[in-house]
Amino acid sequence: MRNAMAGVVFAIVVAGTGAGVGGADGSTDEAEVLKLDQRIADAVVRGDAAFVDSVTPPDFVMVHGDGWTNGGKPLLTDTEQSMLRRVTTKYYDVLDFDSVKAEMHGDVAITYGRYLAHTTSGDDPGRRWFSVWFERVYAKRDGRWVYLSHRTVHGPTFGADRKSVSDK
């Protein structure tokens, strides 16, 4: 319940800073944001830091782990530069999205859903596969969508193989 409430509070705070919900081209913007969300994930797996850099601002923030949702600390907080280093080193070799939706607020979009990920780094094979439920924030700047922020709202949940995390 706390995790759900934290996500709702976060969404309300972010939405409150933007324009009203929707617009004449809301469905086009929604499709564009969802496509960009996937393109970013694909670029991360490819190690395409140039593309990821082109759609993230210098004040980008990525909060890993859901400890923050109940008063604790996140596992890690990335800036744009530390996240780009992770992209360059191809930390993730799988980043598959599912259940992703977009909530549109004029020139602000919140995407939320889950991804399954795999990394070859680390000594513990039981922590190489994981699932994460997330919220991401985008803003339309100068006619294009920019990826501002990512927050884990549940997870990561680790497992030894894809199947062990696919229902988490």
What are these regions (language model features)?
Residues S131-F158:
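Short beta-strand edge/turn micro-motifs at domain boundaries
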Residues S121-D124, T157-R162:
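A short, polar/proline- and glycine-enriched secondary-structure boundary/capping micro-motif
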Residues T28-L34, A49-H105, R114, G126-F130, ...:
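A solvent-exposed, acidic/Ser-Thr-rich amphipathic alpha-helical stretch
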Residues M62-V63, T111, Y147-S149:
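Short hydrophobic/aromatic-rich beta-strand segments that constitute the beta-sheet cores
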Residues A102-A109, P125, Y138-W145:
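A short, structured loop/turn motif at beta-sheet edges
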Residues F10-I12, G18-D59, D107, L148, ...:
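Short, low-complexity N-terminal intrinsically disordered segments enriched in polar/charged residues
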Residues A117-H118:
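Short glycine/acidic-enriched loop and turn motifs that connect beta-strands
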Residues M1-V8:
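Bacterial N-terminal signal peptides that target proteins for export
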